[in-house]
Amino acid sequence: MFVRWPYPSTATRIEPSMSLSPFHLAIPVHDLPAARRFYGETFGLEEGRSSAQWVDFNFYGHQLVIHEHPKTASQEHASTNPVDGHDVPVPHFGIVLGWEQWEALAGRLRSFGTQFVIEPYIRFQGQVGEQATMFLLDPCGNALEFKAFKDMGQLFAK
């Protein structure tokens, strides 16, 4: 799969990889217009089908669907888990990018004035699984993580 980041604001078309099956993830949002702007404009994700209650997005070749729904308990009472000295929001979802793609995304998000839960940084430096990571919330409280591995071959390494 390849990703070309538009900088700073044009949409990108990401094609699913033939070697990895696209996943489908549906998440609740209590403010559909704000979430639509966030995923469409901030990330430049291509919009697919939609209705008055939901919107499909091409999330790096995967299908992300935002569904309008009242706030959920997980959005009202976020949990965290300590990882590498940071309180990681749980639950969260995201994508593993290439290093340069991650750097471009971090720059894009900063240019939009994004408030990070965990600022972009390098985790597990000098260890197996060294990775760049950042965490943020969408306007409805859903936590996202974007990461890139120094060595992609260590994605599942112990």
Where are these regions (language model features)?
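Conserved active-site tyrosine of GNAT-family acetyltransferases
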Residues: 35-40, 109, 141
